[in-house]
A protein has these predicted regions:
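Short, low-complexity, polar/charged sequence segments that are solvent-exposed and flexible
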Residues: 7-10, 34-36, 64-66, 114-116, ...
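Hydrophobic faces of well-ordered beta-strands that scaffold small-molecule active sites
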Residues: 13-17, 42-48, 72-73, 93-98, ...
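Active-site beta-loop-alpha junctions enriched in small/polar residues
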Residues: 18-22, 47-53, 75-79, 98-102, ...
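Flexible C-terminal active-site loop/helix
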Residues: 149-209
């Protein structure tokens, strides 16, 4: 509880929660508690890291439809994208591909197939910077979320500069990992900066260093 209260205090406007690791009812209670703490004003992203089957994914989609959930990220394993797409059609909550679109070729494949949900893009591992920017140009603004791949702060700065250049800034960015790199001797308080419409320009980003 204290951790989430701290994040709210830092100005975070979106939270990511890992699901699919514990008892379903227990995880639902955790989500409900966070919704209560934020008075339902903070959209929640749920990340299952591809651990679920169809039945469990459907169960979570039913639950998420009653909560302020922005999307459920990669509930099923890579290779199960069409099954995920079929499930998503029955619910208002969006599904996001993460592991399924780690690399540029995968992103192109599902972009060409017109995936109807969200793409979680990790610039540090996706591939060619310019080719990635070209591919992102084809996607609707609200279909892209940029995310950390646990790179150092130097790597994160390069990823963030690509996010700014792409212009896809509708959704909050998933770079809330700075606490993992405090021993690097450099850190950025990225929380409020990485919210919807929070990335103004490269000049704004440089001011953080």
């Amino acid at each position: 509880r204290n951790r989430y209260e701290k994040l709210f205090g830092q100005g975070y406007q979106s939270l990511k929660i890992k699901i699919g690791k514990s008892d379903f009812a227990e995880e639902c209670r955790m989500v409900d508690a966070i919704v209560d703490m934020s008075e339902g004003k903070i959209p929640i992203r749920m990340d299952a890291n591809g651990t679920m089957d169809r039945a469990r994914t459907t169960r979570w989609m039913e639950f998420a439809s009653e909560c302020p959930v922005e999307f459920i990220e990669q509930p099923m394993a890579k290779g199960m994208e069409r099954e995920m797409s079929a499930i998503a059609r029955d619910f208002p909550v969006k599904l996001a591909l993460d592991e399924s679109v780690c690399f540029l070729d995968d992103l192109k494949r599902w972009s060409d197939s017109q995936w109807e949900g969200v793409y979680v893009v990790k610039p540090s591992i996706a591939g060619s910077r310019q080719a990635l920017l070209d591919e992102l140009e084809k996607l609707p603004e609200d279909s892209v979320v940029f995310s950390s791949s646990l790179e150092s702060m130097v790597g994160a700065s390069a990823a963030l500069s690509l996010a700014i250049e792409s212009g896809k800034q509708v959704r909050a960015l998933g770079f809330g990992v700075e606490d993992l790199f405090l021993k690097d001797g450099a850190s950025l308080l990225l929380g409020p900066f990485l919210q919807p419409d929070g990335l103004g320009s490269m000049e704004d980003f440089e001011d953080l260093w």
